[in-house]
Structure formats: C-alpha cells, structure tokens
From Swiss-Prot:
<feature type="compositionally biased region" description="Basic and acidic residues">
    <location>
        <begin position="96"/>
        <end position="107"/>
    </location>
</feature>
<protein>
    <recommendedName>
        <fullName>Acylphosphatase-1</fullName>
        <ecNumber>3.6.1.7</ecNumber>
    </recommendedName>
</protein>
<feature type="active site">
    <location>
        <position position="41"/>
    </location>
</feature>
<dbReference type="GO" id="GO:0005737">
    <property type="term" value="C:cytoplasm"/>
</dbReference>
<comment type="similarity">
    <text>Belongs to the acylphosphatase family.</text>
</comment>
<keyword id="KW-0963">Cytoplasm</keyword>
<keyword id="KW-0007">Acetylation</keyword>
<dbReference type="InterPro" id="IPR020456">
    <property type="entry name" value="Acylphosphatase"/>
</dbReference>
<feature type="modified residue" description="N-acetylalanine">
    <location>
        <position position="2"/>
    </location>
</feature>
<dbReference type="InterPro" id="IPR036046">
    <property type="entry name" value="Acylphosphatase-like_dom_sf"/>
</dbReference>
<dbReference type="InterPro" id="IPR001792">
    <property type="entry name" value="Acylphosphatase-like_dom"/>
</dbReference>
<feature type="domain" description="Acylphosphatase-like">
    <location>
        <begin position="8"/>
        <end position="98"/>
    </location>
</feature>
<keyword id="KW-0378">Hydrolase</keyword>
<feature type="active site">
    <location>
        <position position="23"/>
    </location>
</feature>
<dbReference type="GO" id="GO:0003998">
    <property type="term" value="F:acylphosphatase activity"/>
</dbReference>
<dbReference type="Pfam" id="PF00708">
    <property type="entry name" value="Acylphosphatase"/>
</dbReference>
<feature type="region of interest" description="Disordered">
    <location>
        <begin position="91"/>
        <end position="120"/>
    </location>
</feature>
Amino acid sequence: MATHNVHSCEFEVFGRVQGVNFRRHALRKAKTLGLRGWCMNSSRGTVKGYIEGRPAEMDVMKEWLRTTGSPLSSIEKVEFSSQRERDRYGYANFHIKPDPHENRPVHEGLGSSSSHHDSN
C-alpha cells in the first residue's frame, strides 16, 4: 500500500557541526517531527543526511538545519539536494549512521598482517 504526500531530500550542513552533538540534536528534532532517514559525520567535516516525511514537517526540519542545530554548533550553510516526492517511506525511523572513519585500525598499514598497501 502506497503512502501519499511523502517528500524527501538529502542535506549537508557546513560549519562547526562535528564534535558539538549536532547529530544527536538532529535525531531528536527529526523524531519529534515524525521524520525518517539518517545523518552522519562526513570526512569533509560536515554533517550529511537524508530526511523524508510530510512537507510541513520537512520545512520545519530544513529551517532547523539552517538556523538552529545544536547549542554549540555554528552553521555556515546548508545544501539541500535530490528533493522529490515519493510513493512511500524508505526508512522505518531516523537514525545516526557511524562515522566513515570509525572502525579503522589505529596503525593502519603497520605490521606484516596488514593487507593495506599505499600506492603513492
């Protein structure tokens, strides 16, 4: 069964948004609004994400991402992309994805058992 009037978009928040609980506050705000999707720290020092939900709640979240964030964050700009209307939700809830640089060995490339080789 299709769900009607579901909108979605990707976002990327620039500024001081890592190490200031931005993702945790975004999670709370998205859940409060009934939005679904995810957010994560990027290797570029930004917070990226995807949100889906009803248009009115999406607008509130977009404004929050542009102007509010977490108490210690400093937002320079937000870019929204891939905005579209969907037939149904793609996610069951909103969650925080792990950082792309987590779970890497601390001394990557050291030792004889490493399969990583630099090509420089």
